Amino acid sequence: MLLEKLNSATSKIKLIEEKLQDINLIKDQKKYSKIIKEYTYLEKINTKKIEYEKILSQINDTKTILEKEDQQEMKELIKQELIDLDKKKEDLEHQIKILLLPQDENDSKNIIIEIRAGTGGEEAALFANNLYSMYIKYSEKKKWKTEIINFNETELGGFKEIIFEIKGKDVFKKLKYESGVHRVQRIPITESNGRLQTSAATVAVLPNIEETEIDINEKDLRIDVYRSSGAGGQHVNTTDSAVRITHLPTGIVVQCQNERSQHKNKDQAMKILRARLYEFEDSKKQEQRSSNRKQQVGSGDRSERIRTYNFPQNRITDHRANITLYKLEEFMQGELDPLLDPLMIALQEQELKSNSI
């Protein structure tokens, strides 16, 4: 069964190789990049297929040798070799099944992250700032580039909302599971009685969508301009540079005032709008998928509580995979991989069960 799936996938390699011979293909960089990506993926599958066929052959050969062997001592050695080969086969099958999971076409895309303060007032806004700082530090470790698109700052330096872009290799693949409600438990600096408080911030991770990837009719947009305002300070000016765009069919509203010019703010607002419209359409598709899968795999829904940050205990718990680490301080400094790596594996395991590969 698994070998059939491998053969089916790798049968496309020759066809893609023929396409890559077409000199006109390079003129269309977008199409060329897409085909190269598919070719690279299929080559990975082909490598695993060769490994798998080799180990199946080794198992068969070893079984044949065992049947012909008369000496008991040699039989025991051969049996142990079979046990080792079966273990290798099992591990390889697991790797192959994960490789054969449906590929997310957005994995290689840059992202837009929106962080909003939730319940908890000023403390929630300060936590939103902490999360922003955490993702920036993680991006620096990964050599990714970041840029603020828009923010709404509080008097104490928290964020009611901050929207920023991260550019780099496999950014969406690495951070797509961050969407959801992040809950914090700590004693706020605003709390004079020293009582533990629970607050929350919402994170949305959206793939950065190019203009050519989504059609937006200008007639469906209402564009308003107004004067920048807020506690943000340095970029706020007295001209009508801030832009608010309303997508009339969906009611989605985006605004941007971070840039000095109206033109740049409009470009940034359109970038956010494309991402949100894509998410809107994608969420409709998700609703059509089986309820079984939605129960087992983190849906990426921004209303789903995904993680708790407990500062007194130096504890971070991801509720989707029941992963707990007592390294919260390091985590907030951008050391995310000790949690993100096992989380991705756990969610892939859940997806394997729901896909029955």
Swiss-Prot record:
Keywords: Cytoplasm, Methylation, Protein biosynthesis. GO terms for molecular function: translation release factor activity, codon specific. Methylated by PrmC. Methylation increases the termination efficiency of RF1. The modification N5-methylglutamine is found at residue 234. PANTHER family: LD18447P. Peptide chain release factor 1 directs the termination of translation in response to the peptide chain termination codons UAG and UAA. Its main location: cytoplasm. This is Peptide chain release factor 1. It comes from the Bacteria. It is found in: Cytoplasm. GO terms for cellular component: cytosol. Pfam families: PCRF, RF-1. PROSITE patterns: RF_PROK_I. Belongs to the prokaryotic/mitochondrial release factor family. Residues 283-313 are annotated as: Disordered.
